[in-house]
Amino acid sequence: MENELVIKPRYTLSEELMSAISHGIGVLLAIAGMVLCIVKSASDGSAVGVVSSSLYGSFMIILYLMSTLYHSFKPNITAKKVFRIFDHCSIFLLIFGTYVPYTLVTLHGALGWTLFGIVLGAAVLGIVLNSINLEKYKKMSMICYLVMGWAIIGAIKQIYNNLDFNGVLLLVLGGIIYTIGAVLYG
């Protein structure tokens, strides 16, 4: 029974240290990025943009903070196990947060709110499953990650019509990077 509580170290001490440091830097950069996005949205006079930027930035900060804390604890202590769950759940938050500006600012209307609801639902499902058992629902989590990441395809025409070329390019590159990350993780 005691062996069930033991988690084998997944990373060396130096890997953990580098992850904690780099993700800690990510927290600081996420704060700076969030401030820039909020200032830009406010200068555009967009209340929805300010809210969207705030949500996106907050979820990015949460992701990097949970990862920093996860990598900061020694293996086989309760805090590490708890922050591992938080770390995985925060991925769903960030993917959802990434959609908020696209769904509420770029798309808005019925299509935007529909996509918002679909991605939010998938995020909630993923968070619930990860909170129950990370290993048991790993494949389902992967499916949720990929569905969330590529759900925007259903609105690609409207996205293309409402964003400039660079915006569409960044969206596509972001989707590819999310997918590579999901495949490497899985």
For each predicted feature, which ranges?
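Multi-pass alpha-helical transmembrane bundles in non-GPCR membrane proteins
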Residues: 1-186
